[in-house]
Swiss-Prot record:
Disulfide bonds: none annotated. The gene is RSH1. It catalyses: GTP + ATP = guanosine 3'-diphosphate 5'-triphosphate + AMP. This is Putative GTP diphosphokinase RSH1, chloroplastic. CDD domains: HDc, NT_Rel-Spo_like, TGS_RSH. Residues 710-726 have a biased composition (Polar residues). It comes from Arabidopsis thaliana. GO terms for cellular component: chloroplast.
Length: 883
């Protein structure tokens, strides 16, 4: 068992240069090749990072009156002993000069002048042989036959880029080799590495074609290079018309990248490696380009790396971008990190020692593990900044930067037998940690039992090691060696050059060919879970083609997929992730469009909630659908939900559903409602009303003759007959929107009390009539009881709804708000079916009744209603209004 309590962080020269010390003596510690692709990395491997700020400060050094000007925005080298192992430690050069000069003991720094002026003569140092010598160590894991393919690709790239220079003045070939080296550090397959070497050859030269690449290296390499070329080529196009803007062209660029990703996942991985090296050398770009590229990286590429579980690349992209996007905030965060480390260094070292001792003394771990590594880790600069923003406090109030990461390497199953699994070992270690220190409530997170959608697995807990001496908080992470590998490399593990597996994700994401067919850390099912979000991109493209501009498409992805997420469960235990702030409406449309269209309510953790309920992490969500919902009711509900939909994809689906309902079912909604909706959605009113005219004979069918019935007289002989030709149409909010007609006649006519049935035109027979076949007889029996007590006509309202707490109160509140007088009320619950029936004896005129029924129909969980007037001598012929 090992423990790492300290480390040395050094930032190396990243340009082709002769370094100059403060005394003016020349140094040549770096060659033209070794420093270029390390630019600017604080660590080797995939924890590489930079220590330079994006703001230039000028310092002077020299002798004999000769000064050499040095800019802080060039890459510097310093060494500083810190207590965090294997983590990027970012320190601003200006802070180094101010505070580190006085530091003694184990703290030391060296600062060198960096110049690109001498790079012009470096091209002669670059040959295929020297390039191979520097690339080989990172890809030495590949078999000899595959190394030959990589070497062949290197020669082809060298020939294609011969004579080309980067903005820094270095040979262009340095860039593709650096990309290949990053891919090699991730131990990717040879096809990805060759694609990294050739990713710019077709675009930037006339020497290489896709056909030649396929002939030399196969269809997979061509497919990856072709995807890369499509992505990078569009960004260089100029606007073709005056209506196009630079943002539109860039959006189309990103759209093509997202679509290329859905065909081949390795297109993303190579693109991330390409962007990472470009970010490392971003200092050579003009300031406005630096800000633009860094912002795009922070908004698109870093979240993409996170979705793929590639946290090593994600962290470096975030930190590099953070320095350019917000230099002052970056300085404040790094300064806070340095101060906190100095303040809690002794506590961290002591906590590390105590934990290592506890693990070493545990006999169970000695039996089932090869070794257990305890690492001291510093949180990433940008993650600390985001946490401070989330808490809405000052960065100086943030005090939790340290982590202890425990990585367990279990013995092979043959040696351990059925004694335990790797997961059980992790839980055992968690128990050891809690034996030493009590956890802070609600800080224990089990990502082993419920992994994140990108596959991340680990146990997290936060403790206060020295409660009675200090409030120093320490996060402890526990994982196996395999979990740690997947956490750092993510989906890249699937394409590991040492062991590969391949297959298809449904019918949507082909994975490329497999050279050996071995199984690595991820199988096909694991892979499918981690890249399922790619299928959503393809579905959006197919579903909204022609309805969504490139900019809208990119906004949909960056907001709906790449933003902050919440994770919820389906009733079957599947994990679904949505943007933070998403509602049940977004969840329903994420599951399926038809589910969203037919939704009437939802259950969260077993409780009935509104579809506008904002989802929180770990909630179990179940959608309640209703197939027989009238078009009128569906239109009104979804129109209300539109403003509560968080995701752009859900809003597009709701808008399309509303257009369809407005065009097909105009008889159940007013023309004013349709026109208001069309105006809001920027649709063409004339096109919509033309469809309505063809299907429903325009709006004259909405206005029909009805008889305003009252319950003031028992006998219909005392009810005045209507005059011929009179027309009365009920209104809601001043608009005609109810059609009442005699169901026994095709022609509308006046209804006298006790004659026939008057009903509001339903889209179809309410389904609750089939579920509750005895509803009518139950209702009639209750009304008969009221007749027996009062001996006069009865006006009544019957409401069928889902069985949920508080729904009777909500319905009665609606009735009271409309001025409806309630005389009696009775309710029954069918718990087996989850339905409730409410019967109210009311006093109201027809206009108020129609108005209140429209509002009752919008109450959450209401499935339908009926209303009527009954007389003692003719109960069976009562008038009924039904929806």
């Amino acid at each position: 068992m090992t423990s790492a309590s300290s480390m040395s962080v050094s930032v190396e020269c990243v340009n082709i240069c002769n370094l100059t010390k403060g005394d003016g003596n020349a140094r040549s510690d770096c060659s033209a090749l070794s420093c270029a692709w390390k630019a600017p990395r604080a660590l080797t491997g995939f924890l590489a990072s930079t220590a330079h700020p994006p703001v230039c400060s000028v310092y002077s050094c020299g002798r004999n009156g000769r000064k050499s000007r040095m800019k802080a925005c060039a890459w510097q080298r310093y060494e500083y002993e810190v207590g965090f192992s294997e983590a990027p430690y970012f320190v601003n050069v200006r802070n180094i000069l101010k505070s580190r000069l006085s530091c003694g003991g184990h703290k030391r720094w060296e600062l060198y002048c960096v110049s690109a002026e001498s790079s012009s003569g470096a091209s002669s140092d670059v040959t295929v042989e020297t390039l191979w010598e520097d690339l080989f160590p990172s890809i030495s894991y590949l078999p000899r036959k595959e190394l030959e393919f990589v070497q062949k690709g290197l020669k082809l790239a060298f020939e294609a880029h011969h004579g080309q220079k980067r903005r820094s003045g270095e040979p262009f070939i340095i860039h593709p080799v650096a990309v290949a080296r990053i891919l090699g550090e991730l131990e990717l397959d040879w096809e990805s590495i060759v694609a990294g070497l050739l990713h710019d050859t077709v675009e930037d030269t006339n020497f290489i074609t896709f056909e030649k690449i396929e002939e030399e290296f196969g269809a997979t390499v061509r497919h990856i290079v072709e995807g890369e070329t499509k992505v990078s080529k569009l960004g260089k196009l100029k606007c073709k018309t005056e209506s196009e803007t630079i943002q539109d062209v860039k959006a189309d660029d990103l759209r093509q990248m997202f679509l290329a990703m859905t065909d081949e996942v390795r297109v993303i991985i190579v693109k991330l490696a390409d962007r990472l090296h470009n970010m490392r050398t971003l200092c050579h770009m003009p300031p406005h380009k630096q800000s633009s590229i860094a912002g795009e990286t922070l908004q698109v590429f870093a979240p993409l790396a996170k979705l793929l579980g590639m946290y090593s690349i994600k962290s470096e992209l975030e930190n590099l971008s953070f320095m350019y996007v917000s230099a002052e905030d970056y300085d404040r965060v790094t300064s806070r990190i340095a101060n906190l480390y100095k303040e809690h260094e002794k506590e961290l070292t002591e906590a590390n020692r105590i934990l290592v001792k506890k693990i070493e003394d545990d006999q169970f771990l000695d039996l089932v593990t090869v070794n257990t590594d305890v690492r001291s880790v510093c949180k990433e600069t940008y993650s600390i900044y985001k946490a401070a923003l989330k808490s809405k406090g000052s960065i100086n109030d943030y005090n939790q930067i340290a982590q202890l990461r425990i990585v367990v390497k279990p013995k092979p199953s043959v040696g351990v037998g059925p004694l335990c699994s790797p997961q059980q070992i992790c839980y055992h270690v968690l128990g050891l940690v809690h034996e030493i220190w009590k956890p802070i409530p609600r800080t224990v997170k089990d990502y082993i039992a419920t992994p994140k959608p990108n596959g991340y697995q680990s146990l997290h807990t936060t403790v206060i090691p020295f409660l009675y001496e200090s409030m120093f908080r320490l996060e402890v992470q526990i994982r196996t060696e395999e979990m740690d590998l997947i956490a750092e490399r993510g989906i890249a593990v699937y394409y590991n050059g040492k062991s590969l597996s391949t297959g298809l994700v449904g019918n949507a994401v082909p994975l490329g060919r497999n050279s050996r067919g071995k199984t690595g850390c991820l199988n096909n099912a694991d892979f499918a879970l981690r890249v399922g979000w790619l299928n959503a991109i393809r579905e959006w493209q197919e579903e909204f083609v022609g309805n969504m501009s490139s900019r809208e498409f990119v906004d949909t992805i960056t907001r709906d997929l790449l933003g902050s997420r919440v994770f919820v469960f389906t009733p079957k235990g599947e994990i679904k992730n949505l943007p933070k702030g998403a509602t049940v409406v977004d969840y329903a449309y994420l599951i399926h469009t038809e589910i969203g269209n037919k939704m009437v309510a939802a259950k969260v953790n077993g409780n009935l909630v509104s579809p506008t309920h904002v989802l929180e992490n770990a909630e179990v969500v179940e959608i309640v659908t209703y197939n027989a919902l009238s078009s009128k009711s569906a239109f009104q509900r979804h129109k209300q939900w539109l403003q509560h939909a968080k995701t752009r994809s859900a809003r597009h689906k709701i808008m399309r559903f509303l257009r369809e309902q407005a065009a097909q079912c105009a008889a159940e909604i007013t023309q004013d409602q349709v026109n208001d909706f069309v105006a809001d959605s920027d649709s063409d009113v004339e096109d919509l009303t033309e469809d309505s005219r063809k299907s429903l004979q325009w709006w004259e069918k909405i206005l029909v003759n009805v008889k305003q019935f009252q319950s003031q007289d028992k006998s219909r002989d005392t009810t005045p007959a209507p005059q011929n030709g009179s027309v009365w149409a009920p209104k809601v909010n001043g608009k005609h929107n109810k059609a009442i007609k005699n169901s026994s006649s095709d022609e509308p006519e006046f209804l006298l009390p006790g004659d026939g049935i008057a009903r509001i035109l339903p889209a179809n027979i309410p389904a609750y009539k089939e579920v509750l076949p005895g509803l009518d007889s139950w209702r009639d029996s209750k009304i008969a009881t009221w007749h027996h007590l009062e001996g006069q006509s009865i006006e009544w309202l019957c409401v069928v709804s889902m069985d949920r707490k508080g729904i009777i109160a909500e319905v009665t509140t609606v009735l009271a708000a409309e001025g409806i007088a309630l005389c009696s009320c009775v309710a029954e619950i069918d718990r087996g079916r989850g339905l409730a029936v409410m019967l109210f004896q009311i006093e109201a005129n027809i206009e108020s009744l129609v108005s209140v029924c429209a509002k009752v129909d919008l109450v959450l969980g209401v499935l339908g209603w009926s209303s009527g007037c009954s007389w003692p001598r003719s109960t069976e012929n009562a008038q009924v209004l039904e929806c």
